[in-house]
Regions:
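Binuclear metal-dependent hydrolase catalytic cores
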Residues: 2-221, 304-334, 352, 370, ...
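Generic secondary-structure boundary signal with a strong preference for alpha-helix termini
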Residues: 64, 94, 236-237, 345
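A short, polar/proline- and glycine-enriched secondary-structure boundary/capping micro-motif
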Residues: 88-92, 231-235, 348
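Cap/insert and terminal regions of metallo-dependent hydrolase folds
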Residues: 210, 216-219, 227-325, 419-420, ...
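A polyampholytic, Gly/Pro-enriched intrinsically disordered region
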Residues: 336-351
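Protein-protein interaction and targeting regions used for scaffolding, dimerization, and localization
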Residues: 358-363
Length: 430
């Protein structure tokens, strides 16, 4: 029997691929599952959640690709925002108003399809400041992130105008940071001790990029889609968490499962994607503390074969970033992975007073916070006849619960300090 050596020099009971730092961080409350709302992130911790992991077709347990990165300084980032990912983000306990700072790798719809869906609703839910979106240019202006956002707002014209009879402030505005897709290791975000860099990827068409986030001695790379390339190896050196997209190079088997003709399946991989053998090669060349793969049709029956392909190059720590929602906690001395336990209903979490300030981009706690005024009143958006044909509510509402209708948006204000004191009292009594 061949002798197997743990690359991390582990002893008995450590396995053949697990490092000594593969252990719960000191902030982890449950070693087996992540329960949203029951575990605060540590001040020196990074938490990465795969809130979407699938390209096509979408599955009940795999939304379109999106990776949520939380930092111990309170910052929150989203790398891609694929179809259905907002459902998981809300189920993870993130108030809708805090879904911001979105970094798009490229403009295939499975990487940003939830952007038009969430724009008006998160503004209505308290995000009264502009949405911040970062992404690559295209070969021509009409193919870049800014052009996509412009056309998206045109597409949403009816929705945005109708919702303007609600207090949304500047929430419908989108501040786009579009960088030159050709730029190598350029900085597209630098704030609050966080730096995000980017570099180009080979993915069928010009305008695809990878990202690297660095903060407090911790780092994360998301390759986005693309062929395995030398720039990714170069700019991912020293990273803690390296996440590559991956497609199973198993055309015959995938054809049986999904109906793709093998030549078409192979062509898509060979011109657009990273096969599982190449994922292992990238891990070996980069040597991250943990290598992960997502943006894949997760087939449990093929796990062993895919891992075997990865192991032809990489004998270190590897975990799938699929299905939804895999959670990774990272500190300088520990890396730990779990699956999130999410509620079926996924009701949106209420903003705490501190989160209200964050969403409103306020530095100090005001005595009173007031909702922004309505920009386009309801009565200016409908012809009088349609209002007149509404059925009188007294005909369908039981008498004991009838109330005066609110037909004009009233001013809404609340005392932030009183709210904070009341919440603290509830916590003290619980």
């Amino acid at each position: 029997m061949a002798e197997t050596t743990n690359p991390y020099q582990g002893g008995p009971g450590t396995g053949i691929s697990l490092p000594p730092y593969f252990k719960p961080t000191k902030y982890v409350k449950n070693n087996n599952f992540f329960y949203p709302g029951l575990e605060e992130i540590g001040p020196d911790e990074m938490r990465i959640s795969f809130v979407g992991s699938c390209p096509w077709p979408p599955r009940r347990n795999q939304a379109g690709t999106s990776i949520m990165v939380e930092l111990g300084n309170g910052d929150l980032f989203f790398f891609d925002l694929g179809n259905g990912s907002v459902h998981n983000i809300i189920a993870m306990g993130v108030p809708p108003a805090l879904i911001n700072d979105i970094f798009i790798t490229h403009l295939h719809a499975d990487h940003y399809a939830d952007l038009p869906y969430m724009l008006p609703f998160t503004a209505m839910a308290g995000r009264y400041k502009p949405l911040r979106v970062t992404g690559p240019s295209g070969r021509t202006p009409r193919l870049g992130t800014q052009a996509m956002v412009n056309k998206m707002r045109e597409m949403l014209c009816w929705h945005l105008e109708e919702f303007d009879n609600l207090p949304v402030g500047d929430g419908f505005e989108v501040n786009v940071t579009e960088f030159d897709f050709r730029e190598e290791n350029g900085i597209c975000y630098e704030r609050n001790g966080v730096t995000v860099r980017h570099w180009p990827r080979s993915h069928g068409k010009d305008g695809a990029s990878a990202y690297r986030l660095d903060w407090n001695g911790l780092s994360f790379v998301w390759t986005g889609d693309g062929r395995p390339d030398e720039l990714t190896v170069k700019y991912s050196q020293g990273v803690d968490v390296f996440v590559t997209e991956m497609q199973n190079d198993l055309a015959q088997l995938m054809s049986m499962k999904s109906g793709f003709p093998p030549p078409l399946y192979n062509y898509i991989i060979d011109t657009h994607h990273t096969p599982h053998f190449a994922a292992g090669y990238l891990f070996k060349e980069i040597n991250p503390r943990i290598g992960m793969a997502t943006h894949m049709e997760y087939e449990p029956a093929l796990d062993a074969e895919v891992i075997a392909g990865i192991r032809t190059h990489w004998d270190g720590l590897f975990v799938f970033g699929a299905p939804d929602v895999q959670v990774v906690n990272v500190t300088k001395d520990a890396v730990w992975t779990r699956e999130a336990v999410l509620p079926e209903l996924g009701n949106a979490s209420r903003l705490t007073p501190a989160q209200v300030l964050k969403a409103a981009e306020l530095d100090e706690i005001p005595d009173v916070f007031e909702f922004p005024p309505v920009n386009f009143p309801r009565e200016e958006q409908r012809i009088e006849y349609l209002r007149e044909i509404e059925i009188d509510p007294s005909k369908y509402t039981p008498k004991d619960v009838q109330r005066d209708l609110v037909l004009e948006m009233p001013p809404v204000r609340f005392n932030v300090r009183q709210m904070m004191a009341a919440q603290q009292k509830m916590q003290d009594e619980s």
